[in-house]
């Protein structure tokens, strides 16, 4: 049950009633009308901006319109009080039975509770797409966790999602990888080797060299580069992708599709794209003005094959061919996004590092062009991650050619800490990740605080079974028998309110593509539970389990089970475990 959607519909009914009565003009735009929690919980359970956003179009005084709407809403028996505050906000206080119904809904259908059915076609989410030239670093991990949680969130909101990884295996960097691996092959055979400037120096390529030596012996040594390069490249790429897949699996990241850039080019998709754009009149031969500021060393004033991206909102037109006649990265990227659209996706989401900020407008313009406006692209940029230890910066490089990898961090703090903390800040804000703080058992460590709330409910349930060994304490029995009307303490009411807010949080997070909203709400739920627990330490009558008060115990067991299942559902979206015990 989503009470916000329920009462938003009720507010719309009130507007329609005033329209039928001739007090409001017909055809008002209700698109900006929302029902949300009030800023101050003492003002009520819900608030709506209906009078404020409709007043101008209706040529009415916002406060007077608010009073008229409030009068209509008071006729609903589920609304105990409707009052106008400030310039025209309407605050609603609900019959407690509404919140009792939410708790029972969470108990009776925990798998469905909070889930939405948002409209829309298939979505393609591309995330990680790290170059297959070495181990993943912590920045890759942030994009990976964000993308995976976003997919989980969209699925929970009823959307059809394809999870995709784009393997950049066609650029210059993979030839550099092969040449670097060849030197490790020479090393494995005891031959002189040199990691020249421009090659990848890391020890992570030593196993590649050993594999090549084991497979080919000395057969590659005397061959010219043109002959050994494809063989070495395939082995190195395969082993790098195996390493990346293993790191992703270690933090629970999964993909449905691994799409190869090389297969895109070999299939003729880029050539077909250019032909299509030419047929649409979107490609021309021309010159670009010099870029502002200091000119790059490789800039040339020459005639180029240009894509008319300015017509679709970009800052300038973009080249599709390099001076040597090969395709630009942009041309390949357009062909790749065209392939996603042709595969059926009408909404595309790219999760990229913050250094791709200049890429957004041109790619959105390209998607609009190749889909004739039928597909959209949302680019989510993930800012940098700063590694700290007890507040002090961690040196990111360990030795020449080596750096702190995602696997290093996984091994030190574990999957749950990484996933929760990567999502406990908005993706476009820099994240300080403190290796010491994320394993603390304190309120200041959000992942511990939320997981401990889940474990604490399980502890309460074990206590209840000890106190009432012969009672049926199953979830079904609690949903059927608990008298939730006895829940009147402000702490109990706050827990019910937060449970009721979860469906709205999930839906709004999915619409905004912002999984951090789930993490924030879980912390609020955990905080409400822990606060009430602490009250019970001083006031025995407020303890969750009271052997002499079966009625209150049953009601509180029902309440905390609803809260626990909500925590578990939210943690599942984040990809974090919901432990029954904390050790």
Swiss-Prot record:
Motif ('HIGH' region): 130-140
Domain of life: Bacteria
Protein keywords: Aminoacyl-tRNA synthetase, ATP-binding, Cytoplasm, Ligase, Nucleotide-binding, Protein biosynthesis
Protein name, per record: Arginine--tRNA ligase
E.C. numbers: 6.1.1.19
Pfam families per UniProt: Arg_tRNA_synt_N (PF03485), DALR_1 (PF05746), tRNA-synt_1d (PF00750)
GO cellular component, one term: cytoplasm
């Amino acid at each position: 049950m989503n009470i916000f959607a329920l009462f938003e519909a009720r507010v719309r009914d009130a507007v329609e009633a005033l329209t039928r009565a001739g007090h409001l003009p017909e055809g008002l735009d209700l698109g900006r009308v929302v029902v949300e929690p009030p800023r101050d919980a003492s003002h009520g359970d819900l608030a709506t901006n209906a009078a404020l956003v409709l007043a101008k179009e209706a040529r009415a005084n916002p406060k007077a319109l608010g009073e008229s709407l409030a009068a209509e809403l008071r006729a609903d028996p589920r609304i105990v009080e409707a009052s106008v505050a400030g310039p025209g906000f309407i605050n609603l206080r609900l019959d407690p039975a509404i919140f009792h119904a939410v708790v029972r809904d969470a108990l009776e259908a925990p798998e469905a509770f909070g889930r939405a059915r948002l409209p829309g076609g298939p979505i393609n989410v591309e995330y990680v797409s790290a170059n297959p030239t070495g181990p993943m670093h912590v920045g890759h991990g942030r994009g990976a966790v964000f993308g995976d949680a976003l997919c989980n969130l969209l699925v929970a909101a009823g959307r059809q999602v394809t999870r995709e990884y784009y393997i950049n295996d066609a650029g210059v960097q993979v030839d550099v990888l092969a040449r670097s691996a060849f030197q490790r092959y020479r090393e494995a055979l005891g031959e002189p080797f040199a990691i020249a400037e421009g090659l990848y120096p890391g020890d992570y390529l030593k196993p590649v060299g050993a594999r090549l030596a084991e497979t080919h012996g000395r057969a590659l040594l005397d061959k010219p580069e043109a002959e050994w390069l494809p063989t070495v490249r395939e082995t190195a790429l395969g082993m790098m992708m195996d390493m990346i897949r293993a790191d992703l699996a270690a933090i629970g990241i999964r993909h449905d599709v691994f799409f190869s850039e090389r297969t895109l080019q070999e299939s003729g998709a880029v050539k077909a794209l250019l032909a299509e754009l030419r047929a649409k009149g979107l490609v021309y031969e021309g010159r670009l003005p010099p870029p502002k500021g200091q000119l790059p060393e490789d800039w040339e004033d020459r005639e180029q094959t240009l894509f008319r991206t300015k017509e679709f909102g970009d800052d300038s037109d973009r080249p599709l061919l390099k001076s040597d006649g090969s395709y630009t990265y942009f041309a390949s990227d357009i062909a790749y996004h065209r392939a996603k659209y042709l595969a059926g996706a009408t909404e595309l989401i790219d999760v990229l590092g913050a250094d791709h900020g200049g890429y957004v407008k041109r790619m959105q313009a390209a998607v609009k062009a190749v889909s004739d406006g039928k597909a959209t692209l949302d680019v989510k940029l993930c800012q940098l991650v700063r590694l700290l230890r007890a507040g002090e910066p961690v040196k990111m490089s360990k030795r020449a050619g080596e750096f702190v990898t995602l696997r290093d961090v996984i091994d030190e703090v574990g999957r749950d800490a990484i996933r929760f903390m990567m999502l406990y800040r908005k993706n476009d804000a820099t994240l300080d990740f403190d290796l010491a703080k994320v394993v603390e058992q304190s309120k200041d460590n959000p992942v511990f605080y939320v997981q401990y709330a889940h474990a604490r409910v399980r502890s309460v349930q074990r206590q209840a079974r000890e106190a009432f060994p012969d009672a049926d304490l199953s979830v079904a029995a609690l949903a059927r028998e608990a008298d939730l009307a006895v829940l009147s303490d402000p702490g109990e009411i706050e827990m019910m309110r937060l449970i009721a807010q979860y469906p709205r949080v999930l839906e709004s997070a999915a619409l905004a593509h912002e999984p951090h909203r789930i993490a924030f709400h879980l912390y609020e739920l955990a905080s409400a539970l822990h606060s009430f627990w602490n009250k019970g330490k001083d006031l025995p009558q407020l303890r969750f389990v009271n052997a002499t008060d079966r009625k209150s115990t049953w009601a509180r067991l029902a309440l905390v089970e609803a809260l626990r299942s909500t925590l578990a559902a939210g943690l599942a979206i984040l990809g974090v475990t919901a432990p029954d015990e904390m050790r």
